[in-house]
Curated annotation (Swiss-Prot):
The gene is UBE2DNL. InterPro entries: UBQ-conjugat_E2_core, UBQ-conjugating_enzyme/RWD. PANTHER family: UBIQUITIN-CONJUGATING ENZYME E2. Gene3D superfamilies: Ubiquitin Conjugating Enzyme. Belongs to the ubiquitin-conjugating enzyme family. Residues 1-75 form the UBC core domain. Pfam families: UQ_con. This is Putative ubiquitin-conjugating enzyme E2 D2-like protein.
Length: 75
C-alpha cells in the first residue's frame, strides 16, 4: 500500500514540479528519498538537503526526515 501511494506522489511531482525544490527516490528505493530546496535566495533553508525515509505503513505513520545541514529555528 505504501509503495503504491509513494509512487503515485512521485508521478504527481514529476508531472507538476514544485518551484524552488526537488524531491525523488534515492536510486531505485521508493521508501528512501532525497529533497533539495533551491530557492528563494533569502530563505534560511536555501541549499538544504533532506533525506526522507518512508515507513512500510506510510500514510498511517509519517516519514522520518534527516537534515544534512543546520536548520534555522528562532528559539
Amino acid at each position: 500500500m505504501a509503495l503504491k501511494l509513494i509512487h503515485k506522489e512521485f508521478l504527481e511531482l514529476a508531472r507538476d514540479p514544485q518551484p524552488h525544490c526537488s524531491a525523488g527516490p534515492v536510486w531505485d528505493d521508493m521508501l528512501h528519498w532525497q529533497a533539495t530546496i533551491t530557492r528563494p535566495n533569502d530563505s534560511s533553508y536555501l541549499g538544504g538537503v533532506f533525506f526522507l525515509k518512508f515507513p512500510s505503513d506510510y500514510l498511517f505513520k509519517p516519514p522520518k526526515i534527516k537534515f544534512t545541514n543546520g536548520i534555522y529555528h528562532q528559539r
